[in-house]
């Protein structure tokens, strides 16, 4: 489901950032607008209200902001998924593909127990490489990935379709054309 109209207007577009040809979708304006931020979180949470969700996993960095708010609304725990080397305790790690190479992400090995119901959250899905890696990481430790939620989808880049092909339901609030 997409909530495009007034919520979409709260996202700033910056052309040619971080490089020429890219239309950067800046959610800091949505986050700064209390009503828009509240509505976005409420719309991400609504499908799971009343369902048992054990944890919300957020991808670095804007996924921490949105995921923390979603976890609070669902009375669930929050689990940060970070770039390698950023967590102080024993971690589980996975390599994942980026547009121009490979990177690694990790989470604390004891953050999620096998069988726990988890929602993955981030601000935007583009090619889906990072989200795909996060789903694989969560499944590697036995999580039941119930869904992945994003404020913005760039459907031309195929990320949401990639997650659906992994049997992960995807919820987005708005779409933008292009990169």
Curated annotation (Swiss-Prot):
Entry-linked PROSITE patterns: PUR_PYR_PR_TRANSFER (PS00103)
Keywords: Cytoplasm, Glycosyltransferase, Purine salvage, Transferase
GO CC, alphabetical: cytoplasm
Role according to the record: Catalyzes a salvage reaction resulting in the formation of AMP, that is energically less costly than de novo synthesis.
PANTHER family, alphabetized: ADENINE PHOSPHORIBOSYLTRANSFERASE (PTHR32315:SF3)
Pathway(s) this gene product operates in, as recorded in its UniProt entry: Purine metabolism; AMP biosynthesis via salvage pathway; AMP from adenine: step 1/1
Family classification: Belongs to the purine/pyrimidine phosphoribosyltransferase family.
Species this protein is from: Bradyrhizobium diazoefficiens (strain JCM 10833 / BCRC 13528 / IAM 13628 / NBRC 14792 / USDA 110)
Subcellular location: Cytoplasm
Entry's EC annotation: 2.4.2.7
Class of the enzyme per the UniProt entry, highest EC level: transferase
Assembly description: Homodimer.
One term of GO molecular function: adenine binding
Origin superkingdom: Bacteria
SUPFAM superfamilies recorded: PRTase-like
Catalytic activity: AMP + diphosphate = 5-phospho-alpha-D-ribose 1-diphosphate + adenine
Major location (coarse): cytoplasm
Protein name from the UniProt record: Adenine phosphoribosyltransferase
GO annotation, biological process: adenine salvage; AMP salvage; purine ribonucleoside salvage
Classification via Pfam families: Pribosyltran
């Amino acid at each position: 489901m997409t909530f495009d109209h007034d919520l979409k207007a709260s996202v700033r577009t910056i052309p040619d950032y971080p490089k020429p040809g890219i239309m950067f979708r800046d959610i800091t304006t949505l986050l700064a607008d209390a009503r828009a931020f509240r509505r976005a979180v409420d719309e991400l949470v609504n499908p799971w209200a009343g369902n048992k969700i054990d944890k919300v996993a957020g991808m670095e960095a804007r996924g921490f902001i949105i995921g923390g708010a979603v976890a609070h609304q669902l009375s669930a725990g929050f689990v940060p998924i970070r770039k390698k080397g950023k967590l102080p305790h024993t971690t589980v790690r996975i390599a994942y593909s980026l547009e121009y190479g490979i990177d690694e992400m990790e989470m604390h090995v004891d953050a999620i127990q096998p069988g726990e119901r988890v929602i993955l959250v981030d601000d935007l899905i583009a090619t889906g490489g990072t989200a795909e890696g996060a789903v694989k990481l969560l499944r590697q430790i036995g999580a039941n990935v119930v869904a992945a939620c994003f404020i913005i989808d760039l459907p031309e880049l195929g990320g949401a379709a990639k997650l659906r092909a992994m049997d992960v339901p995807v919820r987005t609030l708005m779409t933008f054309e292009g990169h």
